[in-house]
């Protein structure tokens, strides 16, 4: 295989034995593709599909006026360019969005057109581009920048529209009878439910309102009794015989019934005795006997139901749906034969599979006509309003049959038709789509029929947790729905205005107010439950957040209502949703993560890829199947054995079929898994030896990797899974080359690439410039910084990684550090999962992290005047102002401590009453009262750091201070320098290109040279660019190329001038600040945090712990070579938790490190390249797994590779396809270690040997974002709650510890009276007492006199509010 520039620098040894069938798809596709479909930004307006914005517009427009004399038509929309780029938006706190302009056509019709039938003649057409607010744009990495913060819209898993059949599991009724129900769920509109009650009557509910009899809905659809009975029942004819009634005999209908009388054949043989059940054999006998009719006793007809009216001499004797009783039969027998009752029809019903439910419901239904039924429905939907036929009809029509109010959607119609066994054609014809989106009479009848079939025991209820019944709503679709909500509001307003459009001579812009649209979109992105503050701890947490799937949110579930079934793993999750990665706690199972290979299809259902299998031969054709399409397939596992022809080797194969794992013959197999890791999500697939970890611990491991803080120096995992490269690449934190070329110039903050000739477009200079992000704050206050990994002159290809981001190392995800660990108890310091750490780890800054805090100071307008940012602050000594400049803002580079002033600010204050002491002082010293108070921005408690950046934003129209101007100047200078450099590079590139072109060419003059001169490249390179451009070559083609280059340079100069002017305009213009804000100063503090006791650390297997002590290196256990271990872990943490993966990782890590040491030894001994090759070949190709083609690497590549392997040879043990025990043993032996993985250790304090060998190796440890510095907190005098006057709680409020009820009991039990008294009074809510105590301490007196606690006053006030007067009598 060919290795990329970064891959060949450090090749990860893979143990995978299964063939590589398919690349891992782009991990952010679910976000990026969805929003791309919504905007369709890169498509021409005419070529846009009817989705997203286009669909929203075309569903609302055209809007007709109420009087039909004018209409607004939608033509097309355009998105403008955003005003600020992504980085500017983040620093300014604005939204990264593009203006949306819509071309709207106003058509005014002629009312007075003579011909009444034809469409009104068009009188006037006005077209105009209307501004419709701003639409947030997605960044390349799938995020949105809203008000300066990066946010992610999480996809939602909701119930698919369609029809669902279910039952209550016997919980609704006391008898435990199972009651079935059907529910039609549209994409938007009213829900329609049908349900059985305990008496087997069918009821309907609309929008979960009061129950109605189901037949009322049928009557409202225009069906009468006979039509309803015809639709739902088969009929049986009853004939009047000589002595008995006879019925048509259809033998099949008797199956399973109990014979109520002897069934006798025409020749007198008893075929079925009374009381016997009629089975298949007896049915055959009846059919063979040739009987056509069956004589039945009268009792057989009792309780049967008449299918049609019985009419004699135009008089209705019995109505349809009447139960037959003795009286009726006597009446029928009494008629003479002449009076035409030779036969009548009854409904075919029985107790087994033809229930009488609809007939019984009809009998209970008092409405006799459509009108009555409509009014009944109206009463339920609008209780208390007087119904009229007209309004009732309109309401019913609009609920289910009006496309504006009801929309099943494409998905809903597909699911509906599939469930009822009909065909579904996907169409693009808007009219057919509109027809399909509403319900029809047949739809409702078919749903009822299916429900009755299920009640009769034919058919199954649906499983609502099946992924075929739940679909994904991604960003694009949710944004479209919000946009449509805004447009509907606009439509209402426009309709009223349209009528007067002609008379008032209005244009489309006057008619349309875009505020509601902008507000709806803004509300969705800003405050929807699914628009979340991005988790930006590290690249993995970003990717995982974007791939998250939530069942919560608008239109979804709520935590409280969700039961176990919804949260549980379902067999359709396989390859679609990860069974491991989900939060612990109340959201477990409601928030899931997309599996590695999963994607959504056009209907929003999750699909997973499989290889097709034809007659036992596994092909390389890949087919994506949704959970619906997967029904009926037989899927073999990815590790099924194949022979050399790709045919399944074993006769019986382990397969998944119908949701079960079973063995099946190989010729039955239809598909095969693509990869063993297709089951799990990205985070879970980063856990090596996942297959050896208990699922609960794997869940913790997946979740804790997301909390790892990027360390100062990223260190790739020695034991990985091979997935690290994909995550780092797709997360977007690395700089990736757009095109191949040569690195022209490189420094800490920028890379310049001279593009390859064949990748350039015509007439461009072929230079790509990449600016790096340096020390920027992330959402979680961690540090985002990109580091270059290329050198000048390197050749790179498009897609290569040029710079590492946070937590990446040579293009691989690196969340933690490889630590030398030993599993052994050590003086109780690893009790209860504590971790003992060596001081060496701190010294080498292995777990040192940088955190960046943003502190903001806002100067506002107040009632008493404007706040001022200044260095002149009252009553503050010189020392406190030493770090401020003349504008009152801290210098960059200042090291500050808690309480230091960062930005000096004074606020005007009103007149205050002076105390007698203050008056006296004023009189003596003659000092006038200062009319401002100090409200400066200070460093928060327990924070210490370095100022790394300051930004000043000034309101438009307010003069900028010196600091703002200097920041602006330096930004402009930097930008100018960048542009000049850019131009210089372009000119240099042009020079070398021209020299290359003119090399050996004859010239016809120019630049003071004689005609016919031939110049060599070396001479040309010494000439200036002006001279070169002056030369006129003989050859036409080359002259043409020179002209192109010259034109390009002129354009580039213009382009650079406009860029500079634009940047200057943006910088010098005032900022758009909130109302009443004059100035905002943002100060960024970088805090360096070393690891210390109390910090939380974890491995990747859910093995978490807290650092208990940091020991000197010399006291740590060491091995026979004197190498001390870095970390001592408790061996008791392994067996009960069943995460054995950590032990295997430790062993393999030891081997990896040992091999690195061997390579290091060879390099130090200056071994020949051939020797290195040989050893590398042993490592990569002799022990299991994938073959690495070392021959394709040059000697220099091999040397570079060996240099990078000195710290250890990285291993990739993929999920379910990883290293086996034998292979680990072989590598340990190759590295020169015992295959047991254990070593003899010595106590660092005494030098004595420990009793038995200890497992020592390398484990990848993470430092999690639960740092003791953020949690430690102590309170001095601080703020108090307003009502109770008690101290507030929590670190953020600088609060105290609550001394609760039980603590009071403890002190009572000890009889600690005075301690108790001060706890309940002066330390809590005795306002006067605490002031007096403060005063006493100032005066040097050591006593307290407690007063009345405020909570007592609160109590008396509450009692008074109940109308009981309570007074306090003070007695001496």
From Swiss-Prot:
Its EC number is 2.7.7.6. It is an enzyme of class 2 (transferase). GO terms for biological process: DNA-templated transcription. One of its GO terms (cellular component) is DNA-directed RNA polymerase complex. It comes from the Bacteria. Belongs to the RNA polymerase beta chain family. The RNAP catalytic core consists of 2 alpha, 1 beta, 1 beta' and 1 omega subunit. When a sigma factor is associated with the core the holoenzyme is formed, which can initiate transcription. This is DNA-directed RNA polymerase subunit beta.
């Amino acid at each position: 295989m060919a290795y990329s520039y970064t891959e060949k620098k450090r090749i990860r040894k893979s143990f995978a034995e299964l063939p590589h069938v398919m690349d891992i798809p782009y991990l952010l596709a679910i976000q990026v593709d969805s929003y791309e479909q919504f905007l369709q930004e890169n498509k021409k307006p005419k070529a846009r599909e009817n989705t997203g914005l286009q669909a929203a517009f075309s569903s609302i427009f055209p809007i007709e006026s109420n009087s039909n004399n004018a209409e607004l038509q939608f033509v097309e929309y355009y998105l403008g360019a955003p005003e600020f780029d992504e980085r500017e938006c983040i620093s300014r706190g604005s939204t990264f969005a593009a203006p949306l302009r819509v071309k709207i056509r106003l058509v005014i019709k002629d009312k007075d057109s003579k011909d009444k039938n034809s469409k009104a003649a068009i009188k006037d057409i006005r077209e105009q581009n209307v501004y419709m607010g701003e639409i947030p744009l997605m960044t390349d990495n799938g995020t949105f920048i809203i008000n300066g913060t990066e946010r992610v819209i999480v996809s939602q898993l909701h119930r698919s529209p369609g029809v669902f059949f279910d039952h209550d599991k016997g919980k609704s009724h006391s008898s435990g009878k199972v009651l079935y129900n059907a529910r039609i769920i549209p994409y938007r509109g009213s829900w329609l439910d049908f349900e059985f009650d305990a008496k087997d009557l069918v009821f309907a509910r609309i929008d979960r309102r009061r129950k109605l009899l189901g037949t009322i809905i049928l009557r409202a659809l225009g069906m009468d009794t006979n039509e309803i009975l015809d639709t739902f029942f088969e009929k049986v004819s009853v004939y009047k015989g000589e002595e008995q009634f006879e019925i048509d005999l259809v033998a099949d209908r008797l199956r399973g019934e109990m014979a109520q009388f002897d069934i006798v054949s025409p020749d007198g043989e008893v075929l079925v005795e009374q009381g016997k059940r009629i089975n298949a054999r007896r049915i055959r006998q009846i059919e063979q006997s040739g009987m056509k009719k069956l004589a039945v006793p009268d009792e057989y007809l009792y309780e049967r139901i008449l299918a049609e009216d019985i009419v004699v001499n135009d008089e209705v004797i019995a109505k349809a749906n009447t139960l037959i009783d003795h009286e009726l039969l006597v009446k029928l027998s009494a008629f003479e034969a002449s009076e035409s009752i030779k036969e009548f029809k009854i409904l075919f019903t029985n107790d087994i599979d033809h229930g009488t439910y609809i007939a019984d419901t009809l009998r209970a239904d008092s409405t006799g006509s459509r009108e009555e039924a409509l009014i009944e429905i109206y009463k339920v939907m609008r209780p208390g309003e007087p119904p009229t036929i007209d309004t009732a009809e309109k309401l019913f029509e609009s609920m289910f049959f009006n496309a504006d109010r009801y929309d099943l959607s494409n998905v809903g119609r597909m699911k509906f038709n599939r469930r009822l066994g009909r065909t579904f054609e996907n169409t693009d014809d808007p009219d057919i789509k509109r027809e399909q989106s509403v319900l029809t009479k047949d739809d409702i009848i078919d749903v009822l029929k299916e429900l009755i079939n299920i009640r009769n025991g034919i058919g199954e209820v649906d499983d609502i947790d099946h992924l075929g019944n739940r679909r994904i709503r991604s960003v694009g679709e949710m944004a479209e729905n919000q946009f449509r909500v805004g447009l509907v509001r606009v439509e209402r307003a426009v309709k009223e205005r349209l009528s007067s459009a002609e008379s008032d001579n209005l244009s489309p812009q006057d008619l349309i107010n875009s505020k509601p649209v902008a507000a709806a979109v803004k509300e969705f992105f800003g405050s929807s439950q699914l628009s979340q503050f991005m988790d930006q701890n590290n690249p993995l947490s970003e990717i995982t957040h974007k791939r998250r799937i939530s069942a919560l949110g608008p239109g979804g579930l709520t935590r409280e209502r969700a039961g176990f079934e919804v949260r549980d793993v379902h067999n359709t999750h396989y390859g679609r949703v990860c069974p491991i990665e989900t939060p612990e706690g109340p959201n477990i199972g409601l928030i899931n993560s997309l599996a590695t290979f999963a994607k959504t299809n056009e209907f929003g259902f999750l699909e997973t890829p499989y290889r097709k299998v034809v007659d036992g031969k596994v092909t390389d054709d890949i087919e994506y199947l949704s959970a619906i399409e997967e029904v009926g397939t037989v899927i073999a596992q990815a590790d099924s054995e194949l022979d050399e022809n790709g045919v399944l080797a074993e006769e019986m194969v382990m397969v998944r079929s119908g949701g079960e794992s079973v063995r099946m013959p190989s010729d039955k197999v239809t598909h095969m898994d693509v990869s063993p890791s297709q089951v799990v999500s990205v985070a879970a697939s980063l856990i090596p030896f996942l297959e050896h970890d208990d699922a609960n611990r794997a869940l913790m491991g997946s979740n804790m990797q997301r909390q790892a803080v990027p360390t100062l120096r990223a260190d790739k995992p020695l034991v990985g899974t091979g997935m690290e490269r994909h995550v780092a690449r797709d997360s977007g934190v690395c700089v990736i080359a757009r095109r191949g070329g040569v690195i022209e110039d490189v420094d800490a903050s920028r890379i310049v690439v001279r593009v390859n000739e064949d990748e350039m477009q015509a007439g461009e200079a072929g230079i790509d410039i990449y600016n790096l992000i340096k020390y920027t704050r992330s959402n979680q206050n961690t540090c985002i910084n990109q580091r270059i990994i290329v050198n000048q002159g390197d050749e790179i290809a498009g897609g290569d990684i040029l710079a590492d981001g946070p937590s990446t190392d040579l293009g691989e995800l690196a969340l933690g550090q490889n630590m030398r660990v030993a599993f052994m108890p050590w003086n109780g310091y690893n009790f209860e999962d504590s971790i003992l750490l060596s001081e060496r780890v701190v010294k080498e800054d292995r777990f040192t992290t940088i955190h960046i805090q943003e502190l903001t100071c806002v100067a506002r307008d107040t009632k008493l005047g404007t706040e001022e940012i200044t260095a002149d602050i009252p009553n503050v000594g010189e020392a406190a102002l030493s770090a401020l400049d003349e504008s009152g803002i801290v210098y960059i580079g200042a090291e500050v401590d808690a309480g230091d002033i960062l930005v000096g600010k004074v606020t005007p204050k009103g007149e205050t009453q002076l105390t007698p002491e203050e008056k006296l002082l004023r009189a003596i010293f003659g000092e006038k009262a200062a009319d401002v108070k100090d409200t400066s921005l200070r460093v928060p408690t327990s924070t210490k750091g370095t100022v790394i950046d300051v930004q000043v934003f000034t309101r438009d129209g307010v003069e900028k201070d010196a600091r703002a101007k200097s920041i602006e100047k330096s930004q402009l200078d930097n930008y100018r320098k960048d542009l000049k450099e850019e131009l210089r590079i372009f000119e240099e590139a042009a020079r070398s290109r021209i020299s290359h072109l003119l090399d050996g060419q004859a010239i016809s003059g120019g630049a003071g040279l004689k005609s016919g001169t031939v110049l060599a490249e070396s001479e040309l390179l010494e000439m200036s660019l002006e001279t070169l451009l002056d030369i006129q070559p003989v050859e036409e083609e080359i002259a043409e190329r020179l002209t192109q280059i010259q034109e390009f340079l002129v354009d580039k100069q213009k382009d650079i001038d406009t860029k500079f002017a634009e940047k200057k305009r943006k910088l010098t213009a005032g900022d758009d600040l909130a109302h009443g804000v004059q100035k905002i100063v943002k100060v960024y503090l970088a805090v360096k945090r070393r690891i210390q006791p109390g910090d939380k650390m974890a491995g990747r297997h859910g093995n978490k712990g807290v650092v208990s002590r940091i020991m000197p290196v010399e006291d740590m256990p060491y091995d026979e070579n004197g190498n001390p271990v870095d970390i001592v872990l408790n061996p008791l943490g392994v067996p009960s938790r069943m995460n054995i993966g950590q032990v295997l990782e430790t062993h393999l890590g030891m081997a990896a490190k040992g091999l690195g040491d061997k390579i290091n030894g060879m390099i130090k001994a200056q071994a020949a390249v051939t020797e290195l090759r040989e050893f590398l070949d042993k490592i990569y190709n002799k022990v299991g797994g994938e073959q690495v083609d070392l021959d394709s690497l040059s000697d220099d590549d091999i040397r570079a590779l060996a240099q990078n392997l000195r710290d250890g040879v990285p291993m990739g043990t993929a999920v379910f396809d990883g290293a086996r025990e034998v292979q680990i043993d072989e590598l340990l032996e190759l590295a020169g270690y015992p295959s047991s993985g254990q070593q003899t250790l010595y106590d660092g304090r005494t030098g004595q040997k420990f009793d038995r060998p200890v497992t020592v190796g390398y484990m990848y440890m993470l430092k999690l974002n639960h740092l003791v510095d953020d949690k430690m907190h102590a309170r001095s005098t601080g703020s108090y709650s307003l009502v109770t006057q008690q101290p507030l709680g929590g670190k953020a409020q600088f609060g105290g510890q609550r001394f609760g009820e039980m603590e009071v009991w403890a002190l009572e039990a000890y009889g600690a009276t005075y301690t108790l008294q001060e706890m309940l009074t002066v330390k809590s809510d005795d306002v006067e007492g605490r002031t007096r105590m403060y005063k006493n301490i100032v005066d040097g007196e050591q006593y307290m006199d407690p007063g009345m606690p405020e909570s007592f006053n609160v109590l008396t006030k509450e009692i008074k509010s109940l109308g009981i007067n309570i007074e306090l009598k003070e007695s001496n």
